[in-house]
């Protein structure tokens, strides 16, 4: 199975401009993401998908591969769709979408979503990752997206609010979403053509578009947390984690 991993990266960010190039222990964040991804087994190719020449230069500087995408991409999926069209992938080729703000992603987590497609061919259109929240401060932080899934590990909903809500107890597991997606080229194109969902627009969570239109998202539970970098403070958290790893 041909498996292409794409890392969408944009320079502009309202909370953290230039985030992909922010240094973490002397290397740009995008390099950490790329190098972590390259340790995952089963990948055919890895590319950074960007519309910014500064990011392109940085990636090529450490030996990475880049696909230049349109600056008009309205979402991460649109950027992924643009990239796979340029790469000429086949309809059944697997695409891994690894968010560019995941410098500490564990390679085995990437392998988990690949394995879901290998073990359950044709049973779902999309796969992603969850992690049981340990840090209680994340429970009510809208920057940490929560998720619920059924007994067969199919996603039921994603939210910036704490879900599920325990009416009579606070002692229960809550899972957060990790920014890794897997889908076929065929589904990426179909997904990009779907209209914006009402819930997607409310929560500002693109994956809800798939659920709103009746598509199935399979979930793998990772044993490893991954810090998502949204602010400069998160850079310091990454450096602290790397110091003890």
From Swiss-Prot:
It catalyses: 8-amino-3,8-dideoxy-alpha-D-manno-octulosonate + CTP = CMP-8-amino-3,8-dideoxy-alpha-D-manno-oct-2-ulosonate + diphosphate. It is found in: Cytoplasm. Its EC number is 2.7.7.90. One of its GO terms (molecular function) is 3-deoxy-manno-octulosonate cytidylyltransferase activity. InterPro entries: Cytidylyl_trans (IPR003329), KdsB (IPR004528), Nucleotide-diphossugar_trans (IPR029044). Gene3D superfamilies: Spore Coat Polysaccharide Biosynthesis Protein SpsA, Chain A. One of its GO terms (cellular component) is cytosol. Activates KDO8N (a required 8-carbon sugar) for incorporation into bacterial lipopolysaccharide in the Shewanella genus. This is 8-amino-3,8-dideoxy-manno-octulosonate cytidylyltransferase. It comes from Shewanella sp. (strain ANA-3).
């Amino acid at each position: 199975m041909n498996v292409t991993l794409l890392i969408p990266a944009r320079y502009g960010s309202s909370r953290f401009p230039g985030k992909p190039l922010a240094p973490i222990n002397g290397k740009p964040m995008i390099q950490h993401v790329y190098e972590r991804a390259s340790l995952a087994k089963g990948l055919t190719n890895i590319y950074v998908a960007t519309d910014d020449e500064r990011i392109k230069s940085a990636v090529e500087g450490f030996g990475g591969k880049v696909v230049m995408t349109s600056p008009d991409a309205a979402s991460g999926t649109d950027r992924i769709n643009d990239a796979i069209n340029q790469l000429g992938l086949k309809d059944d080729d697997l695409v891994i979408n690894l968010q560019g703000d995941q410098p500490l992603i564990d390679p085995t987590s990437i392998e988990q979503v690949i394995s879901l497609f290998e073990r359950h061919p044709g049973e779902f259109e999309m796969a992603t990752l969850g992690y049981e929240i340990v840090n209680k401060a994340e429970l009510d932080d809208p920057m940490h997206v929560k998720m619920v899934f059924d007994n067969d590990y199919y996603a039921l909903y994603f939210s910036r609010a704490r879900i599920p809500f325990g009416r009579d107890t606070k002692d229960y597991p809550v899972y957060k979403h990790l920014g890794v997606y897997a889908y076929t080229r065929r589904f990426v194109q179909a997904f990009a053509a779907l209209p914006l969902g009402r819930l997607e627009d409310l929560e500002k969570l693109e994956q809800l578009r798939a659920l709103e239109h009746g598509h199935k998202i399979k979930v793998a539970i990772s044993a490893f947390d991954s810090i998502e970098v949204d602010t400069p403070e998160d850079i310091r958290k990454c450096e602290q984690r790397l110091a003890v790893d």
